Structure formats: structure tokens, C-alpha cells
From Swiss-Prot:
The lineage of its organism: Eukaryota, Fungi, Dikarya, Ascomycota, Pezizomycotina. Disulfide bonds: none annotated. Residues 134-386 form the AB hydrolase-1 domain. It is an enzyme of class 2 (transferase). It comes from Emericella nidulans (Aspergillus nidulans). This is Serine O-succinyltransferase.
């Protein structure tokens, strides 16, 4: 990837302000990125007399702005195009050395898909004891790899580096910690960028729709392989917080303690909307090519923009007020439509850094799995029925069990911008507002009534707002759980929003360590 870094360093300089004198504008030639033409004109502006004639196409009132941010994207596309023709598909997704579990046993997925075989990438820290009862399964967020902490084989710092190790949150003197790259990912586990063994071509968007529960079932295949009958604890943050709860619901007899940080028991409209927007931006990139881009230019522009949207949801407004305020990157220059304010340059950097580090299709599939997440009993029963029907088709010899057809369903009437008179207070209020969790969710979390559960939320989190963690705790209490612990970090403790679980070793790490001990 080093040539791309060179491109980033040689980006065109932002549009510079032109010195002006009263009643006269002298404009130099300005390159227009869209058509590469130059305009060279000088024209007098009179304060009195007859009205000036309308500018002709060759004599514009002002020069066109330059767009170095678009130039950079075009340059990157050109470089990737040349590279893909000369050295095969780009990029290669990897997080470094990891172990790999391969299962030859087919995996039936919740929505009817079938993986004839699959791999799960994983890494471990600490020592597995003789009874194999000191295992902590660490679940990741959406785009993380199995590399949660550095290892001898891969010394690069992991995404939870400060939380894992001797005497730390996940104490490797006591516990054997396992972290996997989720099913559907691109860091060693089977996903859209994996070759389909049926035809030798990459799955791309032929990969079946996934659920969080599918990911957990694949993880437990790994545990079976390692001879781990029961986990000491299931720990996760963000999407990992979903997985941690799902592990307990799916395998209540195989999970001890449960930790869910900045997660939820079911996805809610705001979070779904933000992930949908990211997917739409990505899919509108022409290079996405309906998912079949592996032998050509990856949709780096769509990925960049999707990551920028995601970054807005990962942090908090109050933090950015303190960190960036209204500062511009260079106040001496004329405002530009490309990144100009410090916050814009921050988002631009976040998107640029990510756009070739992660597979676009993995982002689509895994984010959709998050949207589909619902531990309510109704959804669990519907899924059980779907799986039974799919299994019956497989047993009868039907080859295709996955219905890949879909339709764009739009409302017959325009949406109302205000709640209708028929909307009940129960429909409008969350569990945290009413003090009563939905009966369906209470029934769905009943398998966890005898588990020790720690739920942590962050007041400044806008992606998984703190009321969603309160909903988990209140639901568990109503389901009969008498030991659930709920901690909410206020704005006086953390302004880092959803990313707090990655940064706050003292409050997040301290609470988890105390709970595990």
C-alpha cells in the first residue's frame, strides 16, 4: 500500500484566496479538475454607468474552484487500476499472523443460506488450564480483526492492547483469552472476499445474508474444536456486546459470566438508519459493481465516505467542541468545498485511512447483521421456524435453500412527519422511559435469568445510546435476573461517545476486571 501513501502526500494544495483591489478583479488561470481547461481573463467592474453584460462562456465572473479532494480520489483510482492490471486484485486484507480453524461441516444460516465449509481466524493469550474452564471469549466490533493484543508472532498493538495482559482487565495470568474475526469478515474468517469452494470464485454478493447469531454459532464450532465445553465469560463491546448476549441466549449452559459494553438487545431505528446510510453511500460507488470488484478497482470512494459517516456516530459532539471547535485548518486561505474545518480534515483522514483496510462487502454484510439483531422471543421463534424449514429442504436433497430475490418496498402513502393520533404511548416510549421492558424482549432474555451479567453504557454515546443499555438491564431484571450489574458513565466521566470502550481503561476496564474477579 506504500504507493498510496505517496499519493496522499502529493495531493494538490487547497484553493488559495486571490488578492483583490477595489472595483477590479484580476484572476490568474485556474485549472478546472472536471474538464482540465484553463480560464484566463481580466475584466473591469464599474460601480457606475450601464449594467455589465452577462458573462460569456469564455469570460466567467469568477474562476472555478479547485477540488484537491476529488483529484486525490481520481489519482487513487488510476493507481489502483494500474496496479490491478499489473499484479492482480487489490487490496489484500490481512491483520497479520493468526490461527485458523477450518470446519468441513456445513453451516446453516438463519436466513436460509448455507456455507459448505468455513474458516474462523482467531488469536489467543494466556494459558488454557487443565479443566479448560478459564476461557474468556472476546467479541469484536464491526470492523475489528482477531488481533486484540500484540503477540510474539504479530507484535503490532491490538485494538484492545491496554485491556489484555498480566494484571490487566482480561488478566492473562488467570484467563485464556480467545478473540475471533467474525464470520463475514475479511481478516482470515470466511466472508464475501473468500473463494466459494463450489466454483473457485470469490463469493462477493453471492455470500448469504448473515445474523449475529450465525457468527456466534461459528465461534462455538471453534470452541468445540478446542475442547472448551463452557466459557468462564463472554465479553464484548458494540457489536461484540450483541454477540456476548446472543452467546448466552443460544448456549446458556455453555456460558458463565456475560459482559455487554455499549451494546443492545435489539437494534433500534436510529442505529439502523446510520448503518443503512453508510451502505447506500458505498453501494452508489460505481466501482462497487454490485459487489464484484475483486479483480478491479475497489470502491474506495464509497468506503471513505461510509467511514466518515460512521466516525460521526463513534464520537460525541461535546468532545469535538473541545477538540476542534470552529477552527479551520488554515484560516489564512479562502474557504474551500473540500475539507476546510479541522473537524472536516479529521473525518477525511479517518475515511482515507480506512478505505483500503477493510473489505466493502464485509462492511455491507456485517452491518446488515447488526440491523437484523433482535433477541425478542418473537424473532427467536420465527428464526427457529426458518431454520427448521431450511434444514428440511436440505434433508430432502434440495440444493438451493437461500432465496436471494428481493424487492424494493416503498410505502403507498407518504410518511407522516408527526406521530399519528393512534400511536400509543407504549409504542413511543422506550423501556428506560416507562420503567417496563417489552414483554417480548423479557421472554427472549429469559435464558439469562441465572447468569451474572455486567452491562455498561456511556451517556455520550449516540450510536448505542445509554438508554439501550438500561433497556438490557431492566429487561433482565424483569426476566428474573437478580444479579445483573448496570454501570452508566456520565458526561463528566467520558466524552468519547461510542469509542469509550476502546479508550477508557480506568472506568470500562476497571469495572470489567472487578466483575470478572
Amino acid at each position: 500500500m506504500s504507493p498510496l501513501n505517496g499519493v496522499a502526500r502529493s495531493l494538490p494544495r487547497p484553493f488559495q484566496a486571490v488578492a483583490r483591489r477595489p472595483f477590479r478583479v484580476a484572476q490568474p488561470a485556474v485549472a478546472c479538475p472536471s474538464n482540465r481547461r484553463s480560464f484566463n481573463h481580466s475584466r473591469s467592474l464599474r460601480s457606475t454607468g450601464s449594467q455589465s453584460p452577462a458573462p460569456s462562456p469564455r469570460d466567467s465572473s469568477n474562476p472555478a474552484l479547485s477540488f484537491p479532494c476529488l483529484d486525490a480520489q481520481e489519482a487513487k483510482s488510476a493507481l489502483l487500476s494500474a496496479r490491478s492490471l499489473g499484479s492482480g486484485p487489490e487490496p489484500s486484507y490481512t491483520a497479520g499472523h493468526h490461527e485458523r480453524f477450518h470446519s468441513d461441516e456445513p453451516l446453516l444460516l438463519d436466513w436460509g443460506g448455507l456455507l459448505p465449509e468455513f474458516d474462523i481466524a482467531y488469536e489467543t493469550w494466556g494459558q488454557l488450564n487443565e479443566k479448560k474452564d478459564n476461557v474468556i471469549l472476546l467479541h469484536t466490533g464491526l470492523s475489528a480483526s482477531s488481533h486484540a493484543h500484540s503477540t510474539e508472532a504479530n507484535p503490532k498493538p491490538g485494538w484492545w492492547e491496554k485491556f489484555i495482559g498480566p494484571g490487566k482487565t482480561l488478566d492473562t495470568d488467570k484467563y485464556f483469552v480467545i478473540c475471533t474475526n467474525v464470520l463475514g469478515g475479511c481478516y482470515g474468517s470466511t466472508g464475501p472476499s473468500t473463494v466459494d469452494p463450489s466454483d473457485g470464485k470469490k463469493y462477493a454478493t453471492r455470500f448469504p445474508i448473515l445474523t449475529i447469531e450465525d457468527m456466534v454459532r461459528a465461534q462455538f464450532r471453534l470452541l468445540d474444536h478446542l475442547g472448551v465445553r463452557k466459557l468462564y465469560a463472554s465479553v464484548g463491546s458494540s457489536m461484540g456486546g450483541m454477540q456476548s448476549l446472543a452467546a448466552g441466549v443460544l448456549f446458556p449452559e455453555r456460558v458463565g459470566k456475560i459482559v455487554s459494553i455499549s451494546g443492545c438487545a435489539r437494534s433500534h431505528p436510529y442505529s439502523i438508519a446510520m448503518r443503512h446510510t453508510q451502505r447506500q453511500v458505498l453501494m452508489m460507488d460505481p466501482n462497487w459493481a454490485r459487489g464484484f470488484y475483486y479483480d478491479s478497482i475497489p470502491p474506495h470512494s464509497g468506503m471513505k465516505l461510509a467511514r466518515e459517516i460512521a466516525t460521526v456516530t463513534y464520537r460525541s459532539g461535546p468532545e469535538w467542541e473541545k477538540r476542534f471547535g470552529r477552527k479551520r485548518a488554515d484560516p489564512s486561505k479562502q474557504p474551500a468545498l473540500c475539507p476546510d474545518f479541522l473537524i472536516e480534515t479529521y473525518l477525511d483522514h479517518a475515511g482515507e485511512k480506512f478505505c483500503l483496510e477493510y473489505d466493502a462487502n464485509s462492511l455491507l454484510y456485517i452491518s446488515k447483521a447488526m440491523d437484523l439483531f433482535d433477541l425478542g422471543l418473537t424473532q427467536q421463534l420465527a428464526t427457529k421456524k426458518q431454520r427448521a424449514e431450511a434444514q428440511a429442504k436440505i434433508s430432502s436433497g434440495t440444493n438451493t435453500v437461500n432465496d436471494a430475490s428481493c424487492s424494493l418496498t416503498l410505502p403507498e402513502q407518504p410518511y407522516q412527519e408527526q406521530p399519528s393520533a393512534s400511536t400509543s404511548a407504549e409504542q413511543s416510549a422506550s423501556a428506560s422511559e416507562t420503567g417496563s421492558a417489552p414483554n417480548d424482549l423479557v421472554a427472549g432474555l429469559a435464558p439469562l435469568k441465572d447468569h451474572q451479567v455486567l452491562v455498561i453504557g456511556v451517556a455520550s454515546d449516540i450510536l448505542f445510546p445509554a438508554w439501550q443499555q438500561r433497556e438490557i438491564a431492566e429487561t433482565l431484571i424483569q426476566a428474573g435476573n437478580k444479579t445483573v450489574e448496570h454501570i452508566e458513565l456520565g458526561n463528566d466521566v467520558s466524552l468519547f461517545g461510542h469509542d469509550t470502550f476502546l479508550l477508557d481503561v480506568k472506568n470500562v476496564g476497571g469495572a470489567v476486571r472487578k466483575f470478572l474477579d
